[in-house]
Amino acid sequence: MRYRKFGRTGWDVSEIGYGMWGMGGWSGSDDSESIGSLQRAIDLGCNFFDTAWVYGNGHSEKLLGQIVRANPSRKLHVASKVPPKNNAWPAPGNSMLEETYPPEHITQFVDQNLLNLGLESLDLIQLHSWNDGWLEDSRIGTALEKLKSSGKVRAVGLSLNRWQPWNGVKAVRAGLADSVQVIYNIFDQNPEDELFPACRENNVAVIARVPLDEGSLTGTLTASSRWPGNDWRNKYFSGENLQETLKRVGALKALLPSGMTLPELALRFILSNPDVSTTIPGMRKTRNVEMNTAVSQNGPLPADLLAELRKHRWVRKVTPESFAAKVKRKLRSFLPTR
């Protein structure tokens, strides 16, 4: 496993981190399997783990706390998130801080995060949605600094809205965040335009999420792909989106060098960008842990292949069937009304 600096924190984090959204009780999740996969990742050098309260009302956090306590001799970086008070994803453009992240709400949920994890402090706490307009309210900066000075958290970050990597650039330049979490993959390359340069200039860490594009870049989707029950992927990969996705994935498969899988291509594309501190694929099964962590040893992609992949940027249209709309409904079902 290779390690990278996590921005101005100076932490050495594994460039393949661990995204724990799928361990919050979603379809197909199994706690014993999850614990086994987490331990295997640790044994293979993974030391950065990203969770959130909304991943099963703290269930994912409890699993992470369990595995951290089972490995007391290893330095594992724990990152979690505070949901917005109004339970709205993505953050409405006209929302005010009082509706989303008033200081007392942030403090309350950090205490809940720590209780679920069974830990005394967090390495990184992130706001689970963000709008640069909230910078106009000075309370947000004060609240986050108080958290760090209290010793409850070591660093603070922002999880940016899907399709809005620009909506966080002001916060980065203002020095509010130690890290940003953003969707970045072969299709979603927009963070390279404004966000990554701002992070580079201000020594802010970048967490690349959704590296496999909700599963399309595993290369296993077909025209008949379906998921159990009301799994959100049935909406996301439906109709024209599924057909267009399959077409674009097929074009990527045609570029694969001999012996390289599509997931390896996708992860190495991300890791070829030095602005990325870590990427956090979801890995509920041990075999996926082993395949994904092994990618780290292969290094960046060849320059000519990387240049070809730059041509595959895809700006999806936001529709009612989009993940953003689906996750908003799903997460509201997890959260209490306040």
Language-model segments: which ranges?
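N-terminal binding-site loop/beta-alpha segment at the start of enzyme catalytic domains
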Residues: 1-76
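Conserved, mostly hydrophobic/aromatic
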Residues: 6, 18, 34, 41, ...
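Acidic (Asp/Glu)-rich catalytic clusters
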Residues: 8-10, 67-73, 77, 114-118, ...
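Short, acidic/polar
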Residues: 29-41, 100-117, 162-171
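Beta/alpha (TIM)-barrel catalytic core signal, keyed to glycine-rich beta->alpha loops juxtaposed to Asp/Glu
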Residues: 57, 129-321, 332-338
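A short, structured active-site edge motif that brings together acidic residues
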Residues: 74-87
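Surface-exposed, active-site-proximal loop segments in enzymatic domains
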Residues: 86-100
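Active-site groove signature of glycoside hydrolases
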Residues: 114-133
